[in-house]
Amino acid sequence: LENSTSLLSDPPVAAAVVSHFNDCPDSHTQFCFHGTCRFLVQEDRPACVCHSGYVGARCEHADLLAVVAASQKKQAITALVVVSIVALAVLIITCVLIHCCQVRKHCEWCRALICRHEKPS
């Protein structure tokens, strides 16, 4: 009984540790459509590690959930950029018109647009 417990408590031998994966042979370089080929040693067959957004045994299917999530994020960023540009344009136009009214009183079109409340001199 002592021998069996000592066998269980000994650390595993480093030489017995073998990787489960190897690089795929040249004959399988195109095995995965959207991923990296890895060779399963114990099963003696290739397998794929898919890139983000793809699923399937050979990474042949687009992951629609990943595509939708990425699309929604892009839409939110695009909307934020468009709103920021429009707000900046409105701010610049407002500043130009105020400057025109304050500094250049002789500008007729400016007075007609903004300075209606002022009494003519």
UniProtKB/Swiss-Prot annotation:
What stretches pass through the bilayer? Answer: 76-101
Signal peptide, first to last residue: 1
Keyword Calcium carried by entry: no
The answer, when asked if Glycoprotein is one of the entry's keywords, is: yes
Give the sugar-modified residues.
Answer: 3
Give the disulfide map. 24-37, 32-48, 50-59
Cite the PROSITE patterns for this sequence. EGF_1, EGF_2, EGF_3
Keywords, ordered alphabetically: Cell membrane, Disulfide bond, EGF-like domain, Glycoprotein, Growth factor, Membrane, Mitogen, Secreted, Signal, Transmembrane, Transmembrane helix
Q: Which residues lie on this side of the membrane: Extracellular?
A: 2-75
Assembly, per entry = Interacts with the PDZ domains of MAGI3, SDCBP and SNTA1. The interaction with SDCBP, is required for the targeting to the cell surface. In the endoplasmic reticulum, in its immature form (i.e. with a prosegment and lacking full N-glycosylation), interacts with CNIH. In the Golgi apparatus, may form a complex with CNIH and GORASP2. Interacts (via cytoplasmic C-terminal domain) with NKD2.
Protein's name in the database: Protransforming growth factor alpha
